[in-house]
Amino acid sequence: MILAVFCSFTVSAEKTISSECSIDDINVPIETEETNASIGQTLDIKAKSFILMEPNTKKILYEANADEKLSPASITKVMPLLLVMEAIDRKDITLETVVTASEHACSMGGSQIWLEPGESMTVDELLKATVIASANDACVALGELIAGSEEGFVALMNERAKELGMDNTTFKNCTGLDAEGHLTTAHDVAIMSSELIKHELIKKYSTVWMDSLRDGQSELVNTNKLVRFYKGTTGLKTGTTSIAKYCLSATAERDGLELVAVVLAGETSNDRFNGAKKLLDYGFANYSFTSVKADLKETEKEILDGVKKKVKVSADGTVDILLSKKESKDIKKTTVWNENIKAPIKKGDVLGYVIVNQGENEIGKIEIKALEDVEKLGFLVTFRWILNGIFNL
């Protein structure tokens, strides 16, 4: 009965949704005890390659063999999902856009929702199937919608990977099914995962444990067990093939700190989940953001060639700095002005920066902006002054 709940979901009397799962997914629990490893300690993770990254700064907090090229299985789908999110942002498509399944999309093996050629679903429904159940047919249907063909979509995937600096990645398909030369790294997966979670919409799908399609006839259960069992989980994607073994890109957020943990080539399904959990525990236990304020309240800065000798300025922004909880808080701020600040000046012009340093390293800067307009001192302005002086006599 338990096996049926996780691995076999009713579509009709004849078909069941095929999903990434196995007996050990069901019978072996995820470790519940939190990892309390400190910085410098080694994490016991049973996988060939893994990484922990803070997605905004792209700072690597822990890694092992993170640049080794490996097969990613369905973690590949992070890139198609990113391209779909970007297409929605551009208003090229909407969640209500209807997609008609092609014969090619319906021919996919592996995880699938058994789309029939000519069957129609909305982008919203196909996203559910792709994110929650890792459905290959749904993913290809989305790719064909955006690029006209899977081949064209894969070209877009590789182009976007290059733009993101994923230098060790080559996609051969959009599903992650094993193919010669279809390779990436844990580091590159962390980069594209970081980009995907900038889109809050993805979390509408990646945080869901169970959902359904076809008016409730087709049940979906998330292949990412952390969604149910790990506090703060926000997604993201599992992957399993005979070559790639067990893979996971997992995202979680606690107390304003969001992290991306990637595990590639685990020997068992729970190796990937326990590995990601250990990485996330390590990050949350050892790192946090510190907010540094500019604290440059309204003041004046001398300028050249203006009707006034000084302009009012201020800097009221903040810089959020990712620091280890044991790291030195040796934070210093230095005010640096642009050279030869001359009129005319417009309100909002950037005239300098408050530079934030930790030790010798610059870790952020905050703009110093003009609070007013200042005209250039020219002939017409001078002539106007003279006239004002005459009429004031």
What does each model-found stretch correspond to?
Residues 13-187, 191-200:
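Active-site-adjacent loops and short helices of periplasmic peptidoglycan-processing enzymes
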Residues 1-13:
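Sec-dependent N-terminal signal peptides of Gram-positive bacterial secreted proteins and lipoproteins
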Residues 166-170, 178-393:
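Domain-terminus/edge residues, biased toward the C-terminal soluble/receptor-binding domains
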Residues 11-28, 313-329:
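Short, compositionally biased leader-like segments
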Residues 7, 36-38, 247:
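A generic local structural motif
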